């Protein structure tokens, strides 16, 4: 492959195998199940004591599903995650349980959970007999948590559950010894971006801010840019390929305007542009075929059409023959004197009299005989070879001696030259050579930085929102200077949309511009921005397995409702529903009696 030319991988997800839980998961104590329920991808696995902290979750799949409409393979049931294979042919059928990052369709969420439990090898009968650690959105609505708790306790019969925020679990995993410290978490995912202040290990929910932009919007923006740039390849510029460009070829510019000026230089453009190779066919139909190949192709098409017509005639003949046999059988009933069966058969055939039956038999017999004759004639025609109508060309071997004689005579003619007017030169047809691959390439230049830039400048896609830097400045201004200094010493980046090269350097530049002169700050990128949330939830589950202060049991769910939440270092803040107090019946009765007494006194005074 040439320099800066990258083919699209078009990766197709392989179906997940049904795994075995193993002896560790079936120990004397129930082993927790850890589910990172993300809007882009679901990650599920076991939190086994003594497990190597390195292995990835045993199950990772896209949080989408599609209901089949039948087909050749009869796959009419719902397909989930990696079982879908390539997403592009099914893009119009894909459904997600999430609205932004909040699960709202619990029917689809149940499909994701069924898929997770089945492929993890949960073998308990009638229920999921394991505690569950489940991630939820920042400031998750109470109704969403209530529906999720109802699904887990009523449908799956789990013993207990704990909810937490994915970015806080990632923070917990990267700072296990300083989990009670303060800091600022910048979490950017598939649907939105959050800036979360942490004070002494707990989320300061009233100062959290959300930006409704993430990796999904960046992929959509990149798709629109390239479709406008290459309208001829509109169908080939798919969302899956745009996500591939984002994940593998995009980066964050430390200074966006200065980087755009660099791209104006032709040498810089030539050295840094990424040429994405689209799939294409190197053989052009109709232009590379010889006349003999075209003739052979026409003959094949003619044979195929004749065979198709013959097959249809045979099928029609078979149906007519079966109907004729049925009519002849009914006629035999009449000849044998079985009148009851004969009249019953006439009614089934929707006929009124034996004469009508006889007339129909004659017509059908003629049609069957004609169809047989056509089939025989078609078979004879198939055996006849197609005669080539092209005129025969002279034998080249016979022409070669005469051509040599003419050339030798021209050598002795002093007046003859190839430049003589009236003498035609031999025409040599030069076929131009085209590099077809170059006509199927997407030149991704400034788009490499424009797409991920939207989380810093939402105005690029017309969103009236503040970017990360403005949101960060707004949150810091709400705290005293000493707390500001404490927060900026621990700025933590996590989430799949922070994996762009240059993200950390860009945040350091933004903080340098907004902080006072010679002040210090520290920016840290998660060791694995995608999987650290699951790792942190697993670590938290193992460290708090016997701590009843953080787990919601079934009894507490039944007593306090599905929206109930127990707070911990990685959870949301629980704000219970406050219903207005209703006046008691006794107070209502006293108020009504006082009103009636006052009304009666007034009437007497007026009288």
From Swiss-Prot:
<keyword id="KW-0804">Transcription</keyword>
<feature type="coiled-coil region">
    <location>
        <begin position="288"/>
        <end position="327"/>
    </location>
</feature>
<dbReference type="InterPro" id="IPR043129">
    <property type="entry name" value="ATPase_NBD"/>
</dbReference>
<comment type="subunit">
    <text>Component of the chromatin remodeling INO80 complex; specifically part of a complex module associated with the helicase ATP-binding and the helicase C-terminal domain of INO80. Interacts with DDB1. Interacts with ACTR8; the interaction is observed in asynchronous (interphase) cells but not in metaphase-arrested cells indicative for a possible dissociation of the INO80 complex in mitotic cells.</text>
</comment>
<feature type="compositionally biased region" description="Gly residues">
    <location>
        <begin position="597"/>
        <end position="607"/>
    </location>
</feature>
<dbReference type="GO" id="GO:0051726">
    <property type="term" value="P:regulation of cell cycle"/>
</dbReference>
<dbReference type="GO" id="GO:0045893">
    <property type="term" value="P:positive regulation of DNA-templated transcription"/>
</dbReference>
<dbReference type="GO" id="GO:0070914">
    <property type="term" value="P:UV-damage excision repair"/>
</dbReference>
<feature type="region of interest" description="Disordered">
    <location>
        <begin position="584"/>
        <end position="607"/>
    </location>
</feature>
<dbReference type="GO" id="GO:0033044">
    <property type="term" value="P:regulation of chromosome organization"/>
</dbReference>
<keyword id="KW-0539">Nucleus</keyword>
<dbReference type="GO" id="GO:1904507">
    <property type="term" value="P:positive regulation of telomere maintenance in response to DNA damage"/>
</dbReference>
<comment type="similarity">
    <text>Belongs to the actin family. ARP5 subfamily.</text>
</comment>
<dbReference type="GO" id="GO:0006275">
    <property type="term" value="P:regulation of DNA replication"/>
</dbReference>
<feature type="cross-link" description="Glycyl lysine isopeptide (Lys-Gly) (interchain with G-Cter in SUMO2)">
    <location>
        <position position="283"/>
    </location>
</feature>
<dbReference type="GO" id="GO:0045995">
    <property type="term" value="P:regulation of embryonic development"/>
</dbReference>
<dbReference type="InterPro" id="IPR004001">
    <property type="entry name" value="Actin_CS"/>
</dbReference>
<dbReference type="GO" id="GO:0006282">
    <property type="term" value="P:regulation of DNA repair"/>
</dbReference>
<dbReference type="GO" id="GO:0045739">
    <property type="term" value="P:positive regulation of DNA repair"/>
</dbReference>
<dbReference type="InterPro" id="IPR004000">
    <property type="entry name" value="Actin"/>
</dbReference>
<keyword id="KW-0963">Cytoplasm</keyword>
<dbReference type="GO" id="GO:0060382">
    <property type="term" value="P:regulation of DNA strand elongation"/>
</dbReference>
<keyword id="KW-0234">DNA repair</keyword>
<dbReference type="Pfam" id="PF00022">
    <property type="entry name" value="Actin"/>
</dbReference>
<protein>
    <recommendedName>
        <fullName>Actin-related protein 5</fullName>
    </recommendedName>
</protein>
<dbReference type="GO" id="GO:0006338">
    <property type="term" value="P:chromatin remodeling"/>
</dbReference>
<comment type="function">
    <text>Proposed core component of the chromatin remodeling INO80 complex which is involved in transcriptional regulation, DNA replication and probably DNA repair. Involved in DNA double-strand break repair and UV-damage excision repair.</text>
</comment>
<keyword id="KW-0227">DNA damage</keyword>
<keyword id="KW-0233">DNA recombination</keyword>
<dbReference type="GO" id="GO:0006302">
    <property type="term" value="P:double-strand break repair"/>
</dbReference>
<keyword id="KW-0805">Transcription regulation</keyword>
<dbReference type="GO" id="GO:0031011">
    <property type="term" value="C:Ino80 complex"/>
</dbReference>
<dbReference type="GO" id="GO:0006355">
    <property type="term" value="P:regulation of DNA-templated transcription"/>
</dbReference>
<dbReference type="GO" id="GO:0006310">
    <property type="term" value="P:DNA recombination"/>
</dbReference>
<keyword id="KW-0832">Ubl conjugation</keyword>
<keyword id="KW-1017">Isopeptide bond</keyword>
<keyword id="KW-0175">Coiled coil</keyword>
<feature type="compositionally biased region" description="Low complexity">
    <location>
        <begin position="584"/>
        <end position="596"/>
    </location>
</feature>
<dbReference type="GO" id="GO:0005634">
    <property type="term" value="C:nucleus"/>
</dbReference>
<dbReference type="GO" id="GO:0000723">
    <property type="term" value="P:telomere maintenance"/>
</dbReference>
<dbReference type="GO" id="GO:0005737">
    <property type="term" value="C:cytoplasm"/>
</dbReference>
<feature type="coiled-coil region">
    <location>
        <begin position="355"/>
        <end position="384"/>
    </location>
</feature>
